[in-house]
Every structure is written in structure tokens, then in C-alpha cells.
């Protein structure tokens, strides 16, 4: 069955659907030797040859690919880009290496924001989770500096005008602090550039700390250190897929990796046991010879 080229490439982890549409429009993709056009359809067969910038890439049928999702604790100071000309650290630097696919960030966090950032190997999943029409909730813990009164909170809930259109917090809840340094938990259902900061600035309040603590129903994992990542299990992955109307997965890499770690641990234990037996035998032999 044929599928849109950008969908096949997104599913294979070569970028979000929006990114892939851009590289197709730029003439950087060829199918069986012909420059591809936006809207082209392909059927994934063993003989299919797709190239990006002249490099042959790997694509597989939907049923052959396992969708993987990581939860990453982004520290402040890291950029949401694959490569930085100035050599600054990026969110991709610490992620596990992949063969035949790549990690795609589900949205962005600005350099001064820390917290939960999801990554997936499925570009279609990333695209749908980011799209405003899906209205997936993002929750942030915000420390603000300035006087916050009921009128400002009312404006933030009802909506204020930003340079790229009206915006509002879906929910806003006081969560601690005293005087002019206070913490709030806020939620949005879209991911415009610096939207949380710009909303507060629109009512004359500065954000001094910003942490994303939840995406949909996936929280920032407890105990995860900054710069650390953990892979979501099958139930969590399928929650995200069903949230954006994608078919559920039937298997997960998480179980496979756990089995591999268990086998490795067993191998180490057996090796240690053999070493102990050999060493013990040598010691015993040494005493008998004496």
C-alpha cells in the first residue's frame, strides 16, 4: 500500500513531518533516482531507494518499526538544536545512539528553561503531539519576580494580546513563595516561542525560573537528574499515540533492554563465580603441594 513520502520518512525518524516537507520542497530528496515532489506517494518495498542529500537512507514498513519515546530532563544552558556552530551544548549530546533512526524532539524549550523534553523515533507522533490542533497540555512550574494581584491573574486566565496573537493560560495555580518571589503552576495547550515568559511579561511580571514538569499526562520522572533520560514503557508510549489518534504499538524496546541488562548481569555473576571457583581450586592445590 502506498503512503505519502513525508509520512514514510517521518516514521523512519528522519525528522518531523514539517521538517521533511521542507527538505522535499528544497529538492533534497530523491526516490529511485528522481527528485521527489511534495505529495509524492511511495510503496515501501525491498528495492525502494530513497536518498536525502545523495545519501541512501533506510525505511521500513510501519509494522516493522518500534516507536520509542524518551523523557529527558533538559538542564538550563542547553540548546534545542542538533548542531551549534559555536559548539555550545545541545539536548542531543547525551541521548543514546541509534542505528537506522534518529531522535526527534517533541517541541522545544528555550536555553534558559529546564525540565521535561520528550524525544521519539516516530516523526508522525512528534508532529501530532506538537500541533496546536491537538491541544496537548504542557504544565510549567514558574517562579516570578514582581507584584501579582488578582487583576493580573484574571488577565492571564482570560487572555492577553501578544505580538503573534492572543494567548492565555488554561490554568494558573499559586504554589508557594513570599513577597515578590512567588511560584505558580501554569498550563498551556500550545507551544509558541517563549509563550510562558511572554504572557507574564505582558502583565508586567518577570519570570526568574521556568521548569516544564508535565507533557500530556507524562510527568517529569521523579529522581531523574538534570541531563538524564529514561525510556517510556509500552503503556506510556501508547498513551501518547492514542492521545493523537495513532495506532498503538504491540512491543517496546524497554522490555528488550531490560532483558539484555538481566542477561549481562547473569553473565557477570557466572563469570565471577567461575573465577572464584578457579581461584579457590588454585589456593587449595597450593596448600596440598605444601
From Swiss-Prot:
Gene3D superfamilies: Pseudouridine synthase, RNA-binding S4 domain. Pfam families: PseudoU_synth_2, S4. The active site is at residue 110. Its EC number is 5.4.99.22. It catalyses: uridine(2605) in 23S rRNA = pseudouridine(2605) in 23S rRNA. Residues 3-75 form the S4 RNA-binding domain. GO terms for molecular function: 23S rRNA pseudouridine(2605) synthase activity; RNA binding. Keywords: Isomerase, RNA-binding, rRNA processing. InterPro entries: PsdUridine_synth_cat_dom_sf, PsdUridine_synth_RsuA/RluA, PsdUridine_synth_RsuA/RluB/E/F, PsdUridine_synth_RsuA/RluB_CS, RsuA_PseudoU_synthase, S4_RNA-bd, S4_RNA-bd_sf. CDD domains: PseudoU_synth_RluB, S4. It comes from the Bacteria. Residues 256-290 are annotated as: Disordered. GO terms for biological process: enzyme-directed rRNA pseudouridine synthesis. Belongs to the pseudouridine synthase RsuA family. Responsible for synthesis of pseudouridine from uracil-2605 in 23S ribosomal RNA. This is Ribosomal large subunit pseudouridine synthase B. The lineage of its organism: Bacteria, Pseudomonadati, Pseudomonadota, Gammaproteobacteria, Enterobacterales. The gene is rluB.
